[in-house]
């Protein structure tokens, strides 16, 4: 039976910007995109900041974008979720955090706060540490000690002095808390099983092994004098009257305030793993500690979790599956996890009726050397699929504008967009021939801004809106759309009722 498929087509990193200088999207020859823009309802979508569950003004990215697209609702990212919880008072009542506070009161013991000391917002945020100090004081926790991991990667390489000063000001304003140890993230936040690094951080925290300093600021300055920037500061101990300020002991509580899991797992395991064999934890290994992690680092870690993952019900894949509709996810390697795992709300398995095609990305050093990447091969496979009437719904990603855009090179990025346009035409014209329709848009900006105002290469994502085209005659698109509105639009085109969990709205005006 002939199918009239509805497709979501993501031109990854294809933003909308009026200025044409350094704008690969504007400078590319793209007759197909321009033809659809001229002949079909079109507009723009917001794809950054609060509109995708990130802090205001923060650029979007592919993971966040595809999660929002698939969910059909704004999905708050960990940083924003925690910020919101602090603002609205939920943080102060958080069960896991309060369990840590209670543990110290019942055991007449100390609370220790571990985490990356910066406002980089990638692994942690210093504001969350300050909120923990304020909350612990309000809840009557007697002693709190901070084990500060210095950044220098997500922020400037020598910026820790300002963060230490911010922390010391908070401690002084509250007249509460003290810094106990300081360590570069290279040691405390290793993720590559370099256990000798983790061991140094662990032994500083538990056994006060390492160089001793009266003042964290002096410690960092000594490290700089030794050519070691923030990231590489060797774990060291802060002393008062010649004695270590604090170590983690039996019956204490720990809150690890990093929200990104990958670099917090190993140190957490060093404290909680009963079957430990990576290094000798020594006689001081603390027993009966209450260990709390800000988010779920790994289900195998014996810890309470302050902000559990949000389980997403009725993402686009599940809704299509429940309706008995067949669906295809197709992309090349670079964006395959995005059209599958992220689009499915962090789920690896296919839904019933969901099929997947993975086309290998070319094996080149950098994609500016092959700007077309695998766009032709992806399209060949998809055209074959559409001709054979295989699927009711299609989710396709063209990786080129983003992956080549990251090179910061204008000419290859223009070529990348031209290759995508040629293949976009092959796909969309065939869908239209079959009586179907497509939603053509991007997940975030990048290739529309290839140079800085000073004329230097620009390699990052942007906060600009993205274009959207719905290839259906006789409808009008409303303004004010965002990525969360794409899945409801697809359901609208398929004649499927939107589930209550999808708070996004169809872009098609009723």
From Swiss-Prot:
Q: Which reaction does it catalyse?
A: (2R)-2-phosphoglycerate = (2R)-3-phosphoglycerate
Q: Does the keyword ATP-binding apply?
A: no
- Name the Enzyme Commission number(s) assigned to this protein: 5.4.2.12
- Entry GO CC: cytosol
- Chain positions recorded as Mn(2+) 1 binding sites: 402, 406, 461
Which residues of this UniProt protein bind Mn(2+) 2? Answer: 12, 62, 443-444
- Provide the residue positions that the database annotates as binding substrate: 123, 153-154, 185, 191, 260-263, 335
Cofactors needed by this protein, per the record, are: Mn(2+)
- One example of a Gene Ontology biological process annotation: glycolytic process
Active-site residues annotated for this sequence: 62
Name the CDD domains on file: iPGM (cd16010)
NCBIfam families, A to Z: pgm_bpd_ind
- Name the record gives this protein: 2,3-bisphosphoglycerate-independent phosphoglycerate mutase
Which species is listed as the source?
Listeria innocua serovar 6a (strain ATCC BAA-680 / CLIP 11262)
Lineage at the top is: Bacteria, Bacillati, Bacillota, Bacilli, Bacillales
Per the record, the gene is gpmI
């Amino acid at each position: 039976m002939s199918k009239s498929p509805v497709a979501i087509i993501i031109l990854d990193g294809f933003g909308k910007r009026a200025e044409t200088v350094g704008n690969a999207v504007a400078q590319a020859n793209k007759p197909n995109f321009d033809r659809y823009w001229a002949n079909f309802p079109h507009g723009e979508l917001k794809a950054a900041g609060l509109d995708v569950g990130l802090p205001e003004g923060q650029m979007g990215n592919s993971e966040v974008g595809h999660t929002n697209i698939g969910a059909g609702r704004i999905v708050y990212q960990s940083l924003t979720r925690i910020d919101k919880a602090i603002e609205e008072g939920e943080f102060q009542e958080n069960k896991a955090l309060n369990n840590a506070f209670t543990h110290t009161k019942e055991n007449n013991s100390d609370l220790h706060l571990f985490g990356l000391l910066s406002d980089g917002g990638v692994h942690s945020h210093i504001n969350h540490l300050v909120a923990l100090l304020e909350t612990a004081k309000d809840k009557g926790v007697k002693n709190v000690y901070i084990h500060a991991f210095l950044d220098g990667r997500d922020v400037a390489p020598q910026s820790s002095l300002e963060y230490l000063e911010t922390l010391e000001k908070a401690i002084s304003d509250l007249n509460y808390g003290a810094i106990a140890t300081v360590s570069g993230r290279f040691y405390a936040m290793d993720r590559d099983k370099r256990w000798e690094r983790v061991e140094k951080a662990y032994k500083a925290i538990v056994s006060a092994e390492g160089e001793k300093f009266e003042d964290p600021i002096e410690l960092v300055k000594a490290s700089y004098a030794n050519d070691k920037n923030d990231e590489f500061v060797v774990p060291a101990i802060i002393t008062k009257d010649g004695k270590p300020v604090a170590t983690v002991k039996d019956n204490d509580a720990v809150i690890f305030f990093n929200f990104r899991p990958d670099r917090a797992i190993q140190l957490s395991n060093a404290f909680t793993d009963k079957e430990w064999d990576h290094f000798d934890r020594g006689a001081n290994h603390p027993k009966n500690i209450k260990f709390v992690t800000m988010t779920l680092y790994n289900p195998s870690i014996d810890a309470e979790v302050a902000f559990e993952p949000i389980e997403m019900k009725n993402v686009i894949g599940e809704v299509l599956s429940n309706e008995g509709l067949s669906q295809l996810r197709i992309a090349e390697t670079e964006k395959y996890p995005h059209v599958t795992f992220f689009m499915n709300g962090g789920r690896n398995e296919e839904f019933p009726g969901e099929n997947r095609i993975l086309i290998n990305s070319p094996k080149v050093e950098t994609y500016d050397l092959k700007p077309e990447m695998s766009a032709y091969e992806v399209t060949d496979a998809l055209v074959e699929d559409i001709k054979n009437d295989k699927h009711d719904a299609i989710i396709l990603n063209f990786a080129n504008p983003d992956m080549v855009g990251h090179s910061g090179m204008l000419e290859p990025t223009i070529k990348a967009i031209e290759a995508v346009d040629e293949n976009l035409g092959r796909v969309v014209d065939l869908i239209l021939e079959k009586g179907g329709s497509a939603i053509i848009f991007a997940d975030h900006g990048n290739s529309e801004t290839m140079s800085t105002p000073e004329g230097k290469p620009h390699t990052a994502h942007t906060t600009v809106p993205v274009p959207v085209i719905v290839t259906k005659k006789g409808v009008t698109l409303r303004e004010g759309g965002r990525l969360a509105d794409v899945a409801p639009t697809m359901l609208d085109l398929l004649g499927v009722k939107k589930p209550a969990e999808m708070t996004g709205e169809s872009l098609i005006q009723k």
